[in-house]
A protein has these predicted regions:
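Acidic, PIN/NYN-like endoribonuclease modules and their adjacent C-terminal/linker elements
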Residues: 1, 106, 110-136
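Short, well-structured N-terminal submotif of metal-dependent ribonuclease cores
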Residues: 1-36, 50-67, 136
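A generic structural signal for residues located within well-ordered alpha-helices
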Residues: 4, 100-101, 127
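A generic structural signal for short hydrophobic patches within well-formed alpha-helices
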Residues: 9, 41-44, 86, 124
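Residues that scaffold the ATP/ADP-binding catalytic core of kinase and kinase-like folds
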Residues: 11-12, 47, 88-89, 127, ...
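A general structural signal for well-ordered alpha-helical segments in protein cores
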Residues: 19-22, 41, 63, 67, ...
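Active-site neighborhoods of divalent-metal-dependent phosphate/nucleic-acid chemistry enzymes
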Residues: 33, 46-51, 60, 72-119
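Residues at the C-termini of beta-strands that transition into short coil/loop
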Residues: 38-39, 82, 120, 135
Length: 136
């Protein structure tokens, strides 16, 4: 099972323009194997809100994508930050702190025995989580 990082969701947002390796990988894996962290939802929500402040039309497109595609597509497969994830995340910060959001995504994957799918492999390496880069 795979937890998709924000950059993977963004890449697949417009399949015709997505990198061919990312498209091929996504097509080869059963949709039921794709999960997202609640932190990824936070990141795409934040991005949409920030863009909407500068460009209402683009913000509306992103809102439609989130509400019409992402949330329904991942219904039942959005993993929360619960006590086990919070405790695992805390351990990831000692002795070397890492980005809070990345640590929460990594901790979610570790608790659930999943692989993080991301272009930002280096951001997750220190956590010990299995990572896959579909661009390579």
């Amino acid at each position: 099972m795979h937890i998709l990082d924000t950059n993977v969701l963004s890449e697949l947002r417009r399949p015709a323009k997505a990198h061919k390796k990312v498209r091929a990988w996504a097509a080869a894996v059963a949709v039921s194997q794709f999960y997202v962290s609640a932190i990824t939802i936070l990141e795409i929500e934040l991005g949409a809100l920030l863009i909407a402040r500068k460009d209402a039309q683009q913000g509306a497109h992103l809102r439609a994508w989130i509400d019409g595609e992402i949330l329904p597509r991942f219904e039942g497969r959005i993993l929360p930050v619960d006590t086990a994830v919070a405790q695992r995340c805390a351990r990831l910060h000692v002795p070397n702190p890492m980005s809070e959001r990345d640590a929460l995504i990594a901790a979610t994957a570790l608790v659930h025995g999943m692989t993080v799918v991301t272009r930002n492999v280096a951001d997750f390496r220190a956590s010990g989580v299995d990572v896959f880069n579909p661009w390579e």
